[in-house]
Curated annotation (Swiss-Prot):
Organism per entry: Salmonella newport (strain SL254)
Lineage: Bacteria, Pseudomonadati, Pseudomonadota, Gammaproteobacteria, Enterobacterales
Gene Ontology molecular function: any one: sulfate adenylyltransferase (ATP) activity
Subunit structure: Heterodimer composed of CysD, the smaller subunit, and CysN.
Broadest EC class assigned to this enzyme: transferase
G2 as annotated region, ranges: 92-96
UniProt region (G5), positions on chain: 206-208
Catalytic activity: sulfate + ATP + H(+) = adenosine 5'-phosphosulfate + diphosphate
Similarity comment text for this entry: Belongs to the TRAFAC class translation factor GTPase superfamily. Classic translation factor GTPase family. CysN/NodQ subfamily.
Region (G3): 113-116
Protein name in UniProt: Sulfate adenylyltransferase subunit 1
A Pfam family reported for this protein in Swiss-Prot or TrEMBL: GTP-eEF1A_C
């Protein structure tokens, strides 16, 4: 067992008390990103090493791996703690998104180590989609690079408001303050073009030597700010979803027997209470909450992020992909939207193409109507293009086959974020964030017979895995 972990358990008075203390710690999800060879994996390895999160057998294995695959001579290659793929170790790069967990006395952390190579930018976007904070690594010898700008823009596009600019490899520039100051000024000049109200902090460090990572550096006494670990432990993360109206996308209809019907999913935003009136979209039917069922038993109230099963007082038609919200909330389903897109496929995105799109639990089809512009990540300017290439970022106009209950992504990432799926290969080819909703161009009303509506309801109720379209929802949306 890790000696520091054993000591923590002893201090808490046993395993159960220690586990209870862990549950009450706040959780910070963050990612490391930046250009190639800026030291992202080494930084994570250093954090794990200096917070004593490495077990003895892992340390022994690291010594052996450093001799075979290491790039640091006789020193431990801490990057090997994170780079687990054989191709990563052979090339000395990160390809996949690697997740690691560690905790200190103040906080729990989940780290996403993302690749720096441009061809793996799509992997970086995947890692950023669930994070609250981004650590942007900059090589002190190279300064701000294109990939630094790209990752900064993607992070803010995906709703990350806290950026820690870690200027790494200060040991290779003799820990000069003027180098740090110059890079800081260059990045702040670039950051003026980034969207949103951002919290940007700067830390000069050396991941290889451990300077300013978990302990203050004796080599940079000119830096009076906190270490990287102190920033991570103290940054105040205000989740926007806690303040947003209630949104509950239905992931699964739970019917284990004839006496129970519940609607399972994760509460995307807001809160819900027993007895609260709710509305189902796209049908618009209302009911009230009878029970809130969780793994630990029934609750009177649930908050954003909790996995729950809602039991309603009325037996109404609800299927996977439907959205539950407060009855007094107004959210008109839309068929047209402007979407910020990060394209992840070799084949470019072009107007006229159709894709399956998935939003929370809802899956439907969409057509690309137009590409307004592509972002030039060097200067964040907009330019006209006929198609969006691999790793391209742009604003796209889309039309959905059926009305969807959508939010603006910056307000609610769950109900405002979607993925593009190739209809032939079933491969995820892009990520989208709703920028604007457009209710113009509604489909003319469609009249369905009573038999068609009843058959559709039966199919959606008893065969939800077929993902049958809600004809009643279409009718309301078209009207």
């Amino acid at each position: 067992m890790n000696t520091i972990l054993a000591q923590q358990i002893a201090n808490e008075g046993g395993v159960e008390a220690w586990m209870m203390a862990q549950q009450h710690k706040s959780l910070l999800r963050f990612l490391t990103c930046g250009s190639v060879d800026d030291g992202k994996s080494t930084l994570i390895g250093r954090l794990l090493h200096d917070t004593l999160q490495i077990y003895e057998d892992q340390l022994s294995s690291l010594h052996n791996d450093s001799k075979r695959h290491g790039t640091q001579g006789e020193k431990l290659d801490l990057a090997l703690l994170v780079d687990g793929l054989q191709a990563e170790r052979e090339q000395g790069i990160t390809i996949d998104v690697a997740y690691r967990y560690f905790s200190t006395e103040k906080r729990k952390f989940i780290i996403a180590d993302t690749p720096g190579h441009e061809q793996y930018t799509r992997n970086m976007a995947t890692g950023a989609s669930t994070c609250d904070l981004a650590i942007l690594l900059i090589d002190a010898r190279k300064g701000v690079l294109d990939q630094t700008r790209r990752h900064s823009f993607i992070s803010t596009l995906l709703g990350i408001k806290h950026l820690v600019v870690a200027i790494n490899k200060m040991d290779l520039v003799d820990y000069r303050e003027e180098t740090f100051a110059r890079i800081r000024e260059d990045y702040l000049t670039f950051a003026e073009q980034l969207p949103g109200d951002l919290d940007i902090r700067f830390v000069p460090l050396s991941a290889l030597e451990g300077d300013n990572v978990a302990a203050q550096s004796a080599n940079m006494r000119w830096h009076s700010g906190p270490t990287l670990l102190e920033v991570l432990e103290t940054v105040d993360i205000q989740r926007a979803v806690d303040r947003q109206p209630m949104r509950f996308p239905v992931q699964y209809v739970n019917r284990p027997n004839l006496d129970f019907r519940g609607y399972a999913g994760t509460l995307a935003s807001g809160s819900v209470k027993v007895g609260e009136r709710i509305k189902v979209l796209p049908s618009g039917v209302e009911s009230s909450v009878a029970r809130i069922v969780t793994f630990d038993g029934d609750k009177e109230e649930a908050c954003a992020g909790e996995a729950i099963t809602l039991v309603l007082n009325d037996d109404i038609d609800i299927s996977r992909g439907d959205l539950l919200l407060a009855a007094n909330e107004t959210l008109a389903p839309a068929r047209h939207a402007a979407i910020d897109v990060v394209w992840m496929a070799e084949q470019p995105l072009a107007p006229g193409q159709s894709y399956d799109v998935k939003l929370a639990g809802k899956k439907t089809r969409a057509r690309i109507e137009a590409i307004r512009y592509q972002i030039d990540i060097n200067n964040l300017t907009q330019r006209d293009v006929e198609s969006l290439p691999l790793n391209g970022i742009g604003l796209v106009e889309m039309t959905f086959d059926e009305p969807l209950a959508l939010d603006i992504y910056q307000q609610n990432p769950v109900t405002g974020g979607l993925i593009f799926i190739d209809r032939l290969s079933n491969v995820t080819v892009g990520a989208g964030m709703v920028r604007e909703l457009d209710e113009r161009g509604a489909t003319p009303p469609v009249e369905y017979s009573a038999f068609e509506l009843e058959l559709n309801a039966l199919v959606r109720r008893h065969f939800p895995h077929w993902d049958a379209r809600d004809l009643l929802g279409d009718k309301h949306g078209a009207a």
